[in-house]
Amino acid sequence: LRKSLLLLSSVLAGSLMLAGCSSEKDAASGDKTYTIGVTQIVEHPSLDAAYEGFKKALAENGYKEGDNVKFDVQNAQNDQSNSQSIAKKLVGDKVDLIFANSTPSALHVLNETKEIPIVFTSVTDPVGAGLVESFEKPGENITGTTDTNPDAIPQTVGFMVDEAGAETIGVIYNSGEQNSEVQVKQVNEIAKEKGAEVVEVSISTSAEVKQAAESLVGRVDAIYIPKDNTVVSALESVISVANDKDIPLFVGELDSLKRGGVAASGFNYEDLGYQTGLMAVKILNGEKKPSEINVETPESAVLTFNKAAAEEQGLEIKDEWADLVEFLE
């Protein structure tokens, strides 16, 4: 009898250990349906790609839309008051996790909750924006990925001055976007080091973008568009002016490059969204809290060149550039 009891105890202990080991791993396979709130400041290819990457990471790790996950997707259409209302709605609905796709989107949800887990992406300066204390110590309920590589702007502005011969650089941005202010400051610093001048044009809505581009005609040798949600959402207006007036247009990310920019130092936003999705998986699995996950950055930036856009905008392509850039296929 004693041997039987010992054997039974061993079996039960082993079963409990196995159950404990598998509980976190199998969190996605339970009966619970998770509601994930998605807040995005505006529609444009980079942000849309980040969201697709986020969903892909969740699906590949057992959190599938229509199965055990429901996405409540909200787009603010570049309206700050809409973004604030979306934040209130998602928090009021008590979603299980929030995916904040842009700096203002993340700020607005963080202002509304210190309890619901938040993962952000497409954020240029999370510390400067007040989203996190530091990359290593994000905060109680928030973490995510930044879309900034420290080499990106120096690479692009350096190429504009040293290789494309730009002595004056026009920059269009929304001064209401904190992420844009950070980028424009860096553009000015690099340009000054290179002996070039920067002409800034600030706008507040996408309807002002074309007029801003037209105001730079005859005043600049090239234009640089940062990762600014307002301007990027109306990028075709800038491309039209650049093509008509032979002004090389340099941009802040690869999706804008594909739309008609000459060159960009960047990475794939879908990959960045996927990276953020893996963070969400750890949180949903119960493996880690947001405060225990460091803010992450994209991999090294690569300067990529669009030959077709260069020809359209009157920029002569030099043979030696083949050693400096990757050409868009």
What are these regions (language model features)?
Residues 282-329:
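Hinge/cleft segment of the Venus flytrap/periplasmic-binding protein
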Residues 36, 54, 143-194, 294-309:
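An alpha-beta-alpha
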Residues 77-133, 228-243, 247, 252:
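Beta-alpha junction/loop-to-helix N-cap segments that form part of ligand/metal-binding clefts
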Residues 70-92, 202-216:
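Structural motif
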Residues 33-55, 61, 72-81, 176-178, ...:
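Extracytoplasmic "Venus flytrap"
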Residues 17-20:
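C-terminal motif of bacterial Sec signal peptides marking the signal peptidase cleavage site
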Residues 126-168, 268-288:
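Hydrophobic alpha-helical segments within soluble ligand-binding/sensing domains
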Residues 22-24:
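Bacterial signal peptide processing site
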